[in-house]
From Swiss-Prot:
It comes from the Eukaryota. This is Uncharacterized protein YIR020C. It comes from Saccharomyces cerevisiae (strain ATCC 204508 / S288c).
Amino acid sequence: MTFFLKRKISFFLSGIAQTFLFLPILLNRSVIHVVFLTVVLGHRIPWDSVIRCNNTGTTHSAVSSRTELLLPIGGVINNWKRRAWNGFSIQWIWRYSFVY
């Protein structure tokens, strides 16, 4: 895919997500709200601050080991950003779906 096509798709998906962002607030459903926030903020995570590459070419985490347990670091290291973020959002949805 070209850069402009990826950019158009990204803007299109974020526009759809931002359009439906207020729907969960009106419905007062926390799980749906978490899902939409995940879609809106998913492509804006500063992954460069999470993973840094040193001079030897190997990657290491810039966050603490306790945070590493919460983040799917393995997926990020292998450049599976979308898959890693989906795993992270599923953990949040599973954790906060039982609040209400």
